[in-house]
Each structure stands twice: as C-alpha cells, then as structure tokens.
C-alpha cells in the first residue's frame, strides 16, 4: 500500500507496456486468431461477449462491437439498441451463474482513462461483499478463484440454454 491509502499493482504497468500481438487483440479474437485465447461466450452480427482474460472477479465480461470502434460515440443507433439489450441479457446470465451482490459497468476510452486496448469494450464486473482478502492486501495481487476458461465454459453453457433474443430484452 502506498501513501494516502492507495494500492499499487506494479504488474499492471508491465502488462500495459509489455509485448502485445500486432494489431487489435479484440479483432484477432473476433477473427478466431490462433494467437489469442478464445474466451467468447456469445456473438451475433453486431456484438461479442467474452470473459476477460485478466478478470477482476469471476464472471468479468467484455462486451464489444464486432466492427472496430474506439469511441462509444461511433456506435450506430442499431448498435446502441443491441448493446443495451445484450447488456441486460448478460447481466441476467451473470446473476444466475455467479450470484453477485452488485456490478461495476463501464468503458475505459483512451490510454489516459486506463484503456489498454483501443477497441471499444464495455466491462461488466460482478462484485461481492468482502471480496478483498488478506492475500490481496499483503501481496498486492488478486486471488482468482476460478480460471477464466472455466468461467467462459460455464457461461457458454448457460447462454446456450437461454439464448439472446431482442424480443426478451
């Protein structure tokens, strides 16, 4: 812990400044590149939902447009409507799969805002009471209680049982 009650995660900077695949990683995931781990749980013609490879909590999802967009203001009216419906549906899946007590939902647009990927993506982060444990405080690390690949598997199964529909959203 640093001055003023701040926690420092020095590994985050090495990730931000480290080696990344050439090109947009979300476009590579969209195109099923063998160079990226496929953690997608759902896709349609406009959006893809995937488990975050570096989740804050189990069930941390990224919802992003199929086409490469870097600013929320670039979304079409059709994409905005679909985004809202997909977000609502995904929150329902997460409620059933993870039983969180709340959510953080938002964008990081631009490097100054914390975005390490240019492709616009909405974070859906399940939150739980007392989720910061002693290991987090002492080691300055998060303890992942579930492998993101397992989270993706569980959510894919649930999504197959309860398919997305614009009429239900």
PLM feature spans:
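HIT superfamily nucleotide-processing domains
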Residues: 1-169
């Amino acid at each position: 812990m640093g001055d003023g009650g701040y926690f420092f995660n020095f590994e985050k900077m090495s990730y931000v400044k480290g080696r990344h695949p050439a090109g947009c990683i979300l476009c590579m995931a969209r195109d099923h590149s063998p160079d990226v781990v496929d953690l997608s749980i759902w896709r349609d013609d406009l959006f893809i939902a995937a488990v975050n490879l570096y989740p804050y909590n189990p069930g941390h999802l990224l919802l992003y447009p199929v086409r490469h967009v870097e600013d929320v203001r670039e979304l079409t009216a059709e994409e905005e409507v679909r985004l809202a419906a997909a977000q609502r549906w995904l929150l329902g899946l997460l409620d059933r799969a993870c039983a969180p007590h709340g959510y953080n939902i938002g964008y990081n647009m631009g490097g100054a805002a914390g975005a390490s990927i240019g492709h616009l993506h909405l974070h859906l982060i399940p939150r739980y009471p007392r989720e910061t444990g002693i290991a987090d405080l002492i080691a300055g690390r998060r303890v992942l209680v579930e492998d993101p690949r397992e989270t993706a598997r569980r959510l894919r199964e649930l999504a197959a049982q309860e398919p997305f529909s614009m009429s239900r959203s």
